[in-house]
């Protein structure tokens, strides 16, 4: 067994609340890492002050949301990754989360797949030089993201094989993949070398991990058994106004 670590997505768990409150609550719950979506729409000075006051690390943040499936957006995507690498260095994180864009209805799917692979190959040298891993994110289209291109994990893992870079992997969102395909444990076990980060939320509803059909303590035990040592980002919207109790309980699931 190896150390699997929790991280709290402050954009969802503490939506509309201050960085200071979010970071203090995370630390008091016994968790030592946070993550968030966009770095470009935040007061990074205030965020880092709250993070450092509470002795937290930043496990991940996002790249700019620019399509990879449209070659016309390639230059903007590369520029966005370059800017996100600079932000990641400032924030001390080595994981960047990338969405891939929506389906182009007028273009064959194979061409969109190829564009995605080509774009990732172009940014791979930037990531390698910076020692930062970019993780592409499959999302469910049935409930939360209608029209999104990358839905199934098998295509995501195929893309990683085709790109063939140690610095480009998949973020496996357990909530999204439960909706899209199920078979969570086998898909994780068989592809753990291609996974760089996890996300988790209860299903249905995308609320606390304690609520729903996914047996998270068991899932986390199975991830530990693969010797994965990265983070599981807790990315959910709480049903309860006070986040502390649920976070503290989940933190206990990571104690070995």
PLM regions: where:
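N-terminal substrate-binding region of glycoside hydrolase catalytic domains
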Residues: 23-38, 50, 62-66
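Histidine-acidic metal/acid-base catalytic patches
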Residues: 1-30, 92-94, 150-172, 176-256
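Short acidic, glycine/proline-enriched helix-loop-strand junctions
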Residues: 43-61, 132
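Active-site acidic/histidine proton-transfer and metal-coordination neighborhood
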Residues: 40, 53, 70-169, 179
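Active-site-proximal loop/turn and secondary-structure-junction residues that shape catalytic pockets
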Residues: 12-14, 38-40, 64-67, 101-104, ...
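Metal-dependent catalytic neighborhoods of phosphoester/phosphodiester hydrolases
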Residues: 44-48, 73-74, 108-111, 242-246
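Conserved beta-strand positions in the central sheet of alpha/beta enzyme cores
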Residues: 35, 60-62, 97, 135, ...
């Amino acid at each position: 067994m190896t150390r699997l670590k929790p991280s709290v997505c402050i954009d969802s768990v503490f939506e509309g609340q201050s960085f200071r409150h979010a970071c203090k609550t995370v630390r008091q719950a016994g968790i030592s890492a946070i993550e968030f979506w966009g770095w470009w729409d935040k007061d990074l000075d205030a965020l880092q002050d709250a993070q450092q006051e509470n002795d937290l690390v930043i496990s991940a943040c996002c790249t700019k949301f620019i399509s990879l499936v449209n070659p016309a957006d390639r230059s903007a995507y590369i520029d966005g990754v370059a800017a996100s690498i600079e932000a990641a260095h400032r924030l001390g994180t080595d994981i960047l989360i990338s969405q891939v864009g929506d389906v182009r209805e007028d273009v064959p799917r194979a061409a969109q797949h190829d564009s995605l692979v080509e774009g990732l190959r172009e940014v791979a040298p930037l990531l390698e030089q910076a020692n930062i891993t970019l993780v592409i994110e499959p999302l469910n289209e049935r409930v939360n993201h209608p029209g999104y291109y990358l839905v199934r994990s098998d295509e995501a893992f195929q893309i990683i094989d085709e790109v063939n870079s140690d610095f480009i992997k998949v973020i496996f969102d357990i909530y999204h993949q439960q909706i899209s395909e199920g078979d969570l444990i086998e898909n994780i076990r068989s592809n753990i070398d291609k996974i760089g980060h996890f996300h988790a939320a209860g299903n249905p509803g995308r609320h606390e991990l304690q609520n729903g059909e996914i047996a998270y303590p068991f899932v986390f035990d199975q991830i530990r058994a693969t010797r994965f040592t990265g983070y599981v980002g807790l990315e959910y919207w709480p049903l309860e106004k006070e986040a502390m109790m649920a976070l503290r309980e989940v933190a206990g699931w990571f104690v070995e």
